[in-house]
Amino acid sequence: MMTAKAVDKIPVTLSGFMHQLPDSLYPVEDLAAPSVTIFPNGELGGPFDQMNGVAGDGMINIDMTGEKRPLDLPYPSSFAPISAPRNQTFTYMGKFSIDPQYPGASCYPEGIINIVSAGILQGVTPPASTTASSSVTSASPNPLATGPLGVCTMSQTQPELDHLYSPPPPPPPYSGCTGDLYQDPSAFLSPPPTTSTSSLAYQPPPSYPSPKPAMDPGLIPMIPDYPGFFPSPCQRDPHGAAGPDRKPFPCPLDSLRVPPPLTPLSTIRNFTLGGPSAGVTGPGASGGGEGPRLPGSGSAAVTATPYNPHHLPLRPILRPRKYPNRPSKTPVHERPYPCPAEGCDRRFSRSDELTRHIRIHTGHKPFQCRICMRNFSRSDHLTTHIRTHTGEKPFACDYCGRKFARSDERKRHTKIHLRQKERKSSAPSSSASAQSSASGPGGSQAGGSLCGNSAIGGPLASCTSRTRTP
């Protein structure tokens, strides 16, 4: 919108409307609300003859309180003047209004010109019989009754309207997009009026349908499909608990999940007193209740089923015994379980003892620590080892109260107290013997002196001698 108050004829160029305001404008107080009508290319006539129009020299008349003040609008050299032939017309569109001053309530204490929209449209040749007419939107005698602004509108011919409201070119089609997203805007514009002369009032902007809330998933694929990395939706867990497929661990986990098995019962039964095997030969096979022995394990050559728990061969003990020829306290007939390994002459009275011993040869360690994954051949060794992790010390010393995790450690510690006790007991006996040897000759001398003293004192000696004699 353009707002102006003028008292004199003001020459204004078109470029001046677009860029800057002339310095000759100044406000005039107490002016009535005017009405402005612009006829740049039309002819005067019709029911608005009483209004001011454009003169032949291109002047625009603005009606201000009944006075006629022409306004020069010289066109620049690049535009053809109005008197030029009408094979090519230039149409200027604009809206002018004058803001009256409100006492104490206006944001603009002085009237100024505000250019809201102005444009030069070119390229439409109207027919010779086409005329332009104008009408004022407010027909009330007092324009201020409807509002503070007086709006001047213009009416153009049918071809000009077609040029003004021609739809913009459609956007370029995008690959992968359907026609539902972008539709032709001309379908939403109302068709222009069919009459050659019409009055255009302010029309609201056309209403466009809202876009679809949900888009086709095939339009813009945000996440590409990688069948090599992610499984198909039908293979995924419906609850979302299962993640993408992972490669299997290269090392087998069975050794970590499943504990090593114990010695099978069939192996233990092979070394019981059930009798010699069918393949046992030799003179010593039936004597002394001997169990099955491997070839070369004794004086008699015996052929029997080798001991192979989990196909583990029997290996000789590399560390020799501390006392190889030490006689056992238990007689031989009470130790019916000999060791089947070559070069080992151990015998046991219980089968579980033989089983523990055979693990020394085979290297079988069925007991595993779940904390450090260390394996042991005996369960008691595993029990004492676990105490190193837990810090448990169930064995306490009877003398000092010190605690130990193993009973043999407490036993070694107790021997220290026993040796100290022996030393303490031997020290008083030696000191007592030394005192007795030193007090022997001294006691006789004291007795002699005492006797001498008593002899010296006659009546005391006779008294004592009298009392001692019956």
Swiss-Prot record:
Biased composition (Basic residues): 412-422
Single GO molecular function: DNA binding
Modified residues (N6-acetyllysine): 247
Bias kind Low complexity: ranges: 126-141, 426-439
EC number(s) given by UniProt: 2.3.2.-
Modifications made to the protein after synthesis: Ubiquitinated by WWP2 leading to proteasomal degradation.
One GO CC annotation: nucleus
Pathway: Protein modification; protein sumoylation
Gly residues bias spans: 281-291, 440-450
Zinc fingers typed C2H2-type, residue spans: 337-361, 367-389, 395-417
InterPro entries the record matches: EGR_N, Znf_C2H2_sf, Znf_C2H2_type
A biological process from GO: Schwann cell differentiation
Record keywords, A-Z: Acetylation, Activator, DNA-binding, Metal-binding, Nucleus, Repeat, Transcription, Transcription regulation, Transferase, Ubl conjugation, Ubl conjugation pathway, Zinc, Zinc-finger
Highest taxon of the lineage: Eukaryota
Pfam families in the cross-refs: DUF3446, zf-C2H2
Compartment(s): Nucleus
Disordered: annotated span: 126-153, 159-178, 184-211, 275-344, 408-470
Physiological role: Sequence-specific DNA-binding transcription factor. Plays a role in hindbrain segmentation by regulating the expression of a subset of homeobox containing genes and in Schwann cell myelination by regulating the expression of genes involved in the formation and maintenance of myelin. Binds to two EGR2-consensus sites EGR2A (5'-CTGTAGGAG-3') and EGR2B (5'-ATGTAGGTG-3') in the HOXB3 enhancer and promotes HOXB3 transcriptional activation. Binds to specific DNA sites located in the promoter region of HOXA4, HOXB2 and ERBB2. E3 SUMO-protein ligase helping SUMO1 conjugation to its coregulators NAB1 and NAB2, whose sumoylation down-regulates EGR2 transcriptional activity.
Protein family according to the UniProt entry: Belongs to the EGR C2H2-type zinc-finger protein family.
Quaternary organization: Interacts with HCFC1. Interacts with WWP2. Interacts with UBC9. Interacts with CITED1. Interacts (via phosphorylated form) with SFN.
Name recorded for this polypeptide: E3 SUMO-protein ligase EGR2
Lineage: Eukaryota, Metazoa, Chordata, Craniata, Vertebrata
Name of the gene: Egr2
